[in-house]
């Protein structure tokens, strides 16, 4: 089938990596798995083979009949539910997800940040995310040093792990860069007592990264005011630190979140 460039479609076809993604999710038979962008159903097959009850959201209307035909038996049995739409705009309740679930997906690079944010910050977040993303993005999220807005936005909700590099040749059509399997576990919104605390944290982080070449304290002077020095000392942050050198624990301390 002709791939849609506008949807960033690169379908994974290598059996080894398909199995590795499904195995990384540690699926218990009967467990509900939300698959974003099932494409032609290669990963879907691997998930169903491990006993998952798959709920799939596909944006490309041309693939809906393909998937319905391929998984007609599973649809009849109720182990595969297919919905047409944009996963970023779809409410979980609209696709029948109310309890515990996992997210497994080979997602277009251009929606990586938005999709991760959606499923980590839900009132009822996924228990884990296994995502195929751009290699550089996975490295940036999972590394322990040199933080970014994206890495902190993930780590404040869960624990990311870089699983394995997936070479561009494993896809059709092949993308211009390599990909990687990213596993995010132990997901919780419990760090934030309310929406105000959550907003305060992200305002602080985004302001801190506003001008990367400047020292963090300079970026936060207006926001923190006269208390900046005392707050930095309490959080254990060096006066000349840059935003990327500050750990999640220090950011939380700076935001008054324990």
Where in the sequence are the language-model features?
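Active-site catalytic microenvironments for nucleophilic, acid-base chemistry
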Residues: 24, 222, 257
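An accessory alpha-helical subdomain
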Residues: 180-188, 192-228, 235-238, 243-249
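Catalytic cores of RNA-modifying enzymes
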Residues: 1-207, 253
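Peripheral terminal appendages
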Residues: 1-2, 29-32, 42-43, 226-258
């Amino acid at each position: 089938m002709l791939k849609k460039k506008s949807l960033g479609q690169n379908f994974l076809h290598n059996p080894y990596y398909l199995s590795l993604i499904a195995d990384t999710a540690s699926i218990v038979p009967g467990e509900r798995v939300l698959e974003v962008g099932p494409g032609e159903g290669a990963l879907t097959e691997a998930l169903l083979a491990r006993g998952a009850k798959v709920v799939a959201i596909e944006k490309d209307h041309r693939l809906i009949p393909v998937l319905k035909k391929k998984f007609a038996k599973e649809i009849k049995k109720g182990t595969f539910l297919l919905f047409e739409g944009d996963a970023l705009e779809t409410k979980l309740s609209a696709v029948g997800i109310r309890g515990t679930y996992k997210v497994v997906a080979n997602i277009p690079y251009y929606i990586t940040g938005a999709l991760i944010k959606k499923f980590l910050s839900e009132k009822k977040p996924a228990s884990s995310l296994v995502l195929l993303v751009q290699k550089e993005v996975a490295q940036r999220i999972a590394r322990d040093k040199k933080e970014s807005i994206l890495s902190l936005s993930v780590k404040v909700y869960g624990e990311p792990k870089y699983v394995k590099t997936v070479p561009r040749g494993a896809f059709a059509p092949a993308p211009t860069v390599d990909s990687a399997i990213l596993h995010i576990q132990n997901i919780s919104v419990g760090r934030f007592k309310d929406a105000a605390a959550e907003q305060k944290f992200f305002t602080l982080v985004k302001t801190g990264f506003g001008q990367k070449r400047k020292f963090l304290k300079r970026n936060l002077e207006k926001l923190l005011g006269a208390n900046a020095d005392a707050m930095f000392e309490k959080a254990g942050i060096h006066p000349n630190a840059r935003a990327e050198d500050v750990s999640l624990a220090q950011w939380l301390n700076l935001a008054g979140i324990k």
